[in-house]
Every structure is written in C-alpha cells, then in structure tokens.
Amino acid sequence: ATSGRTTLNGEGLQHQDGHSHILASTIPNCISYDPTYAYELAVIIQDGMKRMYEKKEKVFYYITSLNENYVHPAMPEGVEEGIRRGIYRLREAASNNKPVQLLGSGAILRQVEQAAEWLNSKDIAASVWSVTSYNELRRDGLACERETMLSGGERNPEPYVTTQLKHSQ
C-alpha cells in the first residue's frame, strides 16, 4: 500500500487517514513495516520470504511504500537486524556533546534527515534513527514485559528499542 497523507493520497481510503499501521497492530500475525529506502524494503522482503516460505511461519506482511522520486543511498553496514527488528541508527551525530536523537519512518524520514542537517548547521549535533516498524518495537517491548512478569522478575529482558537508544543522550 502507498503510505499517503504526507505526500500523495494513499491507494484506497483506508490508507489516506494514516492509521493503517495502528490497525495492523491489532492483528497478531501481521508484521507491518513503513520503510523509506530500497535497501530497507529488500531486507524486509527477504525476511518475509524466509519466515513465510522457508520457516513456514503463519505470518503475513503489511508494507507501506512511498510514491516519491528520490535518491536511495547504499545500505550502511550492519543494519539488517535493526531493519528487521524495527529501528537502526541511520546517521551518527557529528559530535558527542549531548546530540539530539531524531526518529522517523516512511515518508517523513527524509525530512528528519534534512532537520538533522539544519541542526548541524546551527552547531547542534543530531543522530538520525530510521524506524522501520513501530509495531515490531511495541511487540518486542510487550514480549519483554510479559517475560519479566511470568518469571516473577527473575528474568528482565531489555526491549530492543531500549538497547538501541540507551547510550543516546
């Protein structure tokens, strides 16, 4: 489906109000993503094929795509797991002096990158994070919370988003 809202209207009324990913979160076996770049989409499709056809998992994927023309960068090294799990650092801040952490996904990510450039021009360091799936991050957080509760607090796994952002200021 085309994302809609931030650029051209989505394909079909269900995509024009921006809540299709919220609706997708209510379906337990729906894996939803809102990628920006071609390499993100490639990693997601490869993962989907592996899970659905090789591993025979009973899941399906809902992926929103964009309808704008823009340059797609090469995939940074080592981001595949982050793409699959829902978040990865796209751009490290130029300075470690309390950098701003900017998160974006889908159509808005490119504007987030522009905001980081503007902040850098004002001597404000900014890191950019691509959030490919808020739903997968939520699902992981809930699973960690559940495991902690079921173990009586003996196990306390850290959600992936916390692992990624905890060293950020």
PLM region spans:
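Thiamine diphosphate
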Residues: 2, 6-15, 19, 25, ...
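Short active-site oxyanion
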Residues: 30-31
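Acidic carboxylate-rich catalytic motifs and surrounding loops in phosphoryl-/glycosyl-chemistry enzymes
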Residues: 34-39
